[in-house]
């Protein structure tokens, strides 16, 4: 896949389908308003908690870097939202919730309402629901999908973006088991050991509010910070050609998943950790 390294984000008003395709093909981040009433009503925090609180979502501890344990732990949505609402650890967020979307039927609503975003010759569509504690930051990472969209349905998020040509300064880690390409750098509070390289990196900052959506091209690094109690829909697409271009990485993913065994960390550990943080405060 080709990529662009210009340090700029395009902002467009009410684009047509044709205009959106043309701009996305430039491979630059794009922000635009996308007020889809069905998605805004169905996928906001209040409705999710009311209608689907008894279903499981996946919770991730952003401070857990143990490669021998599972990254994600299932929680009832109402339990996860309680942690997000009451916890002050600023380390838990939820993603990779495809099973949740299927069980609740929300995936059909996302499929019915993404025609404007879906590129031509698409071979695979992936949908996700992302939310987290106020103040939590997702890892700095990039994806290989042909198109990646993040759509804010409630709350507010901040995003930091880094172009692909700065990868050499980011200590890239390729995790084929989870198919995640990440960096240990925290762009929000840079660690001392990475400050020299951080000075060589140019960062773009975005703020997204309800009804706004961002397109993040393949190979662009990004990290999200939840500044309020927020919910975000993620739409990812592969085309036949992009899958072919990424076939070496996809093969590595399949091979790695056959060879790795991970330990499950206890659900009670998350609850105890959250209680300890509350007691300190």
Regions found by a protein language model. Name each.
Residues 1-213, 221-281:
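N-terminal accessory scaffold of Fe(II)-dependent oxygenases
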